[in-house]
Amino acid sequence: MIIIPARLKSSRFENKVLEDIFGLPMVVRCAKNANLVDECVVACDDESIMQTCQKFHIKAVLTSKHHNSGTERCLEAAQILGLKNDERVLNLQGDEPFLEKEVILALLEATKNAPFMATCAKVIDEEQAKSPNLVKVVLDSQSNALYFSRSLIPFLRDAGMKRQTPLLGHIGIYGFHNKEILEELCALKPCVLEELEKLEQLRALYYQKKIAVKIVQSQSVGIDTKEDLQNALKIFSPNLL
């Protein structure tokens, strides 16, 4: 099951999930991409999103406005839907309208092999890595996440030093091996790291849970601001979606 948490009043770009992407609301575009891989449900926090999904025949459920993260919203949706404890759950974002089907498939495959949860990342350049809106991730020897940060990591202390490994930009999608793991993660108390960086995935690392990271090729960009949307619409052609 793929669940897309969709919040209306995003702090940086209010109502963004309803913004038009070549004739379709952003969240609808995301859901249509997801439905190419598996059954998808949008977890809404507002009737306006719910009605938009229904208009375009996208399955949706109404959840609380008071969740602290998209993961918590996914869990409520899974409970409303009555998902079985052993069902895998993918958490995609309502602000990734250009996410390729191949990336979702890669996440699904990685989730099957991950004992706890999985996510994806892509190689980025130094200029891209400077943006705090593009989260960076560093990996251990087994391709599990060591840390996620809005800062540039790893930092090169010595001038002239060359990077031994590529910079990796996190793609904010998650796969949970089963619903019970989603419940386990949401039951953990928020940690100071996730509150400082505003990155919910740091809770799992803080409590020593493994996040497997699949490196993929992707041109997708997350839409965090109005500027992101304007730039993306210039880059992507409606014929490619």
Swiss-Prot record:
Pathway the protein takes part in: Nucleotide-sugar biosynthesis; CMP-3-deoxy-D-manno-octulosonate biosynthesis; CMP-3-deoxy-D-manno-octulosonate from 3-deoxy-D-manno-octulosonate and CTP: step 1/1; Bacterial outer membrane biogenesis; lipopolysaccharide biosynthesis
Which top EC class is named for this enzyme in its record? transferase
CDD domains tied to this protein: CMP-KDO-Synthetase
Q: Give the coiled coil ranges.
A: none
Q: Which EC number applies? A: 2.7.7.38
Question: Where does it live in the cell?
Answer: Cytoplasm
Q: Which GO molecular-function terms appear in the entry?
A: 3-deoxy-manno-octulosonate cytidylyltransferase activity
Which keywords belong to this entry? Cytoplasm, Lipopolysaccharide biosynthesis, Nucleotidyltransferase, Transferase
Q: Which Pfam families does the annotation name?
A: CTP_transf_3 (PF02348)
A Gene Ontology biological process in which this protein takes part is: CMP-keto-3-deoxy-D-manno-octulosonic acid biosynthetic process
Q: Where is it mainly found?
A: cytoplasm
Give the GO cellular component terms, alphabetically. cytosol
**Listed InterPro entries:** Cytidylyl_trans, KdsB, Nucleotide-diphossugar_trans
The Swiss-Prot or TrEMBL record describes its family as follows:
Belongs to the KdsB family.
Primary role: Activates KDO (a required 8-carbon sugar) for incorporation into bacterial lipopolysaccharide in Gram-negative bacteria.
PANTHER family, alphabetized: 3-DEOXY-MANNO-OCTULOSONATE CYTIDYLYLTRANSFERASE, 3-DEOXY-MANNO-OCTULOSONATE CYTIDYLYLTRANSFERASE, MITOCHONDRIAL
- What is the name listed in the Swiss-Prot or TrEMBL entry for this protein? 3-deoxy-manno-octulosonate cytidylyltransferase
State the organism named in the record: Helicobacter pylori (strain Shi470)
